[in-house]
Every structure is written in structure tokens, then in C-alpha cells.
């Protein structure tokens, strides 16, 4: 049995898994996948003479009658898929991450499974100049952020068809199980999209690709084909907008939220009638950092602009024990489930990131955990000293390198 299997079965801690990954580099390609060259440089593909899934795994003697066959349909799919796939807890730059031919989508792409997530995933799609991806529909929630390029997406068919035009920085929802097709409007350059989806969760529940990809059902409460579906927007709460399309979240409105740290501002979106995926954006000032916290749900975070680092650890945040990840515009990180993490801005501009979480979905599943935040008086004082050192280093580097190319560390000890 492999360590990745142990991680999913609970007999191998996420902490140990992350430490092994960080020792090898940024990302480990999944077994059975065609790993991009960049992933190979950061973690070699593990050679096996026998697939560990060939061994039947049973529950312990005191659970499930001592003979329940342990099932993990999503993990089984990961092992068997031939699509280009990487696994880890971050990628350096989603705009330049290597992609490979992907027949099912009619273009190029790479599948991202972060930190052993089993509810959410990420996918990078690349559309060649003046080309389109294959028309598709899926029985799962999906949000799209435009990493680069410009193009259009057509949703639905017949009288219920809608079309949007998007560009770099656009955010939109793909309504559940609605036929859609992405096209590149640029005749010279490829377009690149980042999708965050709930495919893993749906695979865990139903275990059927046929159902997920070929369900003949219209969720009219989520998509009714109205002409203003992608243009309407409503402010429902102080920091909440109900909308299905945002032209450019890199410059869109954020509302002050001092409870998350001095100078912090955020915005949340309710999109597509989704009940799991909860997107939000947050930015914070130069020379500041967010309060450390942890949450009982998975999260995938894309840096939109700025430069800094994140500290993370399982049970606490101590400067001497925490792991450190540097980030820049285009970096994507997914903190391990219920680990403490804290974001620091060492750049010369406000840092802004886009995050997708599960919101209160785990609570609705009965998971008895709460969001926990480390308030300033309880913070390890050495963390502030570490931050000050990093700011001085960043300032010195900026003065000696007028056009800096930030170095990216991958899970190093702080």
C-alpha cells in the first residue's frame, strides 16, 4: 500500500504527506498520469511493479463488521486516469504551468489535485488561437477564472442559449449540467482558464463517470436561460454579491473587513445557485498580514497580484515549527484540510488573492468543527519578527534588482 493511499485512508497524516512532498519539490504526479515536464522536475513519478489498488483494503476488526471493503471512487479514478495530472499543495504560476494534449476537452490542459483534497479540484484549460474546446456538460459545480487571453462561452441551446465575452481577470460560473463551450477569440495567442470544481465530491458520492458526464437533466432552478442571467447582480449582504459573471476581479470592488486584519478588504459571491463552491476575494495593505486561522473545509487560493509568503502548520502557528511558502502573481496554493495558515504581504503593492472554499458545506454534512482564528494577542511574537526580516530582504532585493523575478520556495521550514 502506498503512502498516498494511507493518506486517504487516514493511517498516514497529511503533515507527513506534505513533508514528503516538500522534500521532493513542488508537486508529485499521480500514479498512472502523464505528468508534465515541470512536475517531473519537482517530483519524480513513482515506479511500481504492482498497483496498490489491486489489494483489497478492509476496515479494522472493530469497525464495519471487521470486513467492510474500504471504498474511494475518486482515488480509484485518480489512479486509472490517463489525463495529465499533478498533485501537491501548490503550483508556481498557473499562467505558465505546463499543459499537455487532453483529448476529452479538445485542447490542452492539466488536472490539479491539491493536498489530498477529496471534495474540490482545479483544472487548467488552454485553448489554441482561434479554436474552441469540445462542448461539454457536467453534473458538478464549476467556477471559471480567466488566467490569460480573451474569448467567449456559449451556454445552453435553443431558446435557453446565452453567450458571454470574457477576458483576463473574468470570473464566471458554469451552471450545473448545462451544455457549454469555450472559444478563443484571439487569432494570435492561446487563452488559458482555471476551473475549480466539485467533481471529486460527486465522484465520491456516485462513483459513476457516466452519470457525471451524461446526465440528462436540467437544473432549471440554477439555470433558466434568461437573457440577463450573466448580467444581473444584486448586493445581498455587506460583502456579498449575487451574480454569475464578474468582468475583472483584479480591479473589482472589495469592502473593508477589519476583523480579518488591519486594512483588510474582501468580497464574496453567490454564483449559479451553487451550494458547495463559495468564491471570495481579499486584499490587504503593503507591510501587513492576515490573522492566522484554520477552517474545516477545503480551499484553493490563486494570487492575483502582489508578493509575499504563507506560513502553515497542522496544530498551531509557531515561527520555529511552521512551513513557509513564497507566492507571487499566478501562484496557487491549497492549505491542507483544517491546518492553520497565515498570509503575509512583503511586496510594494496591496496583495490580492482569489479563493474558493466549501463555505458551510461541511457543517451541513455534520462535521463538528468551527473556523478558528488566532487573534493578535495570542500570536507567536516571533512571527512578527520573521515578517519584518522578510520585508527587509524583499526591499533590499527590489533595490538591487529593478526587474525582479521572485524566487519561489516550496514548503520549506520557516
Where are each of the predicted segments found?
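N-terminal secretory signal peptides
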Residues: 1-16, 38-40
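N-terminal export leaders
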Residues: 14-29
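A short, N-terminal "cap"/entry segment at the start of jelly-roll beta-barrel domains
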Residues: 43-118, 209-276, 280, 381-414
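Conserved short histidine dyad/triad with adjacent acidic residue
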Residues: 108, 123-137, 280-294
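Histidine-centered metal-chelating micro-motifs
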Residues: 132-134, 152, 171-172, 176-182, ...
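A short hydrophobic beta-strand segment most commonly corresponding to one strand
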Residues: 143-145, 173, 188-205, 301-302, ...
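Short acidic-glycine-tyrosine-enriched beta hairpin
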Residues: 158-173, 316-334
Amino acid at each position: 500500500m502506498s503512502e498516498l493511499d494511507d493518506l486517504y485512508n487516514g493511517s498516514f497524516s497529511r503533515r507527513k504527506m506534505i513533508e514528503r512532498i516538500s522534500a521532493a519539490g513542488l508537486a508529485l504526479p499521480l500514479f498512472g498520469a502523464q505528468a508534465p515536464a515541470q512536475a517531473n522536475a519537482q517530483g519524480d513519478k513513482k515506479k511500481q511493479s504492482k498497483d496498490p489498488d489491486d489489494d483489497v483494503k478492509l476496515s479494522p476488526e472493530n469497525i464495519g463488521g471487521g470486513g467492510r471493503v474500504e471504498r474511494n471512487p475518486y482515488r480509484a479514478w485518480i489512479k486509472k486516469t490517463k489525463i495529465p495530472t499533478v498533485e501537491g499543495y501548490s503550483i508556481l504560476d498557473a499562467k505558465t504551468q505546463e499543459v499537455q494534449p487532453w483529448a476529452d476537452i479538445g485542447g490542452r490542459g492539466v488536472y490539479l489535485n491539491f493536498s489530498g483534497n477529496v471534495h474540490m479540484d482545479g483544472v487548467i484549460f488552454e485553448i489554441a488561437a482561434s479554436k474552441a474546446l469540445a462542448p461539454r456538460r457536467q453534473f458538478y459545480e464549476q467556477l471559471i477564472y480567466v488566467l490569460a487571453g480573451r474569448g467567449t462561452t456559449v451556454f445552453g441551446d435553443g431558446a435557453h442559449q446565452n453567450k458571454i465575452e470574457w477576458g483576463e481577470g473574468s470570473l464566471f460560473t458554469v451552471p450545473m449540467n448545462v451544455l457549454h463551450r469555450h472559444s478563443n477569440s484571439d487569432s494570435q495567442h492561446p487563452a488559458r482558464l482555471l476551473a475549480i470544481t466539485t467533481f471529486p465530491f460527486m465522484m465520491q458520492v456516485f462513483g459513476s463517470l457516466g452519470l457525471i458526464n451524461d446526465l440528462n437533466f436540467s437544473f432549471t432552478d440554477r439555470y433558466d436561460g434568461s437573457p440577463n442571467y450573466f448580467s444581473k447582480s444584486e448586493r445581498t449582504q455587506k460583502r456579498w454579491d449575487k451574480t454569475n459573471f464578474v468582468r475583472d476581479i483584479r480591479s473589482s470592488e472589495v469592502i473593508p473587513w477589519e476583523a480579518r486584519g488591519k486594512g483588510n478588504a474582501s468580497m464574496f459571491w453567490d454564483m449559479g445557485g451553487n451550494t458547495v463552491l463559495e468564491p471570495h476575494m481579499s486584499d490587504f495593505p503593503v507591510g501587513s498580514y492576515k490573522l492566522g486561522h484554520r477552517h474545516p473545509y477545503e480551499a484553493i487560493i490563486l494570487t492575483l497580484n502582489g508578493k509575499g509568503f504563507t506560513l502553515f502548520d497542522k496544530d498551531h502557528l509557531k515561527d520555529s515549527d511552521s512551513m513557509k511558502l513564497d507566492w507571487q502573481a499566478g501562484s496557487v496554493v491549497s492549505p491542507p484540510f483544517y491546518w492553520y495558515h497565515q498570509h503575509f504581504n512583503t511586496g510594494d503593492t496591496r496583495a490580492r488573492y482569489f479563493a474558493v472554499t466549501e463555505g458551510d458545506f461541511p457543517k451541513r454534512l455534520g462535521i463538528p468543527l468551527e473556523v478558528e482564528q488566532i487573534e493578535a494577542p495570542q500570536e507567536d511574537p516571533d512571527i512578527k519578527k520573521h515578517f519584518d526580516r522578510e520585508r527587509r530582504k524583499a526591499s533590499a532585493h527590489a533595490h538591487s534588482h529593478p526587474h525582479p523575478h521572485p524566487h519561489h520556495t516550496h514548503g520549506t521550514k520557516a
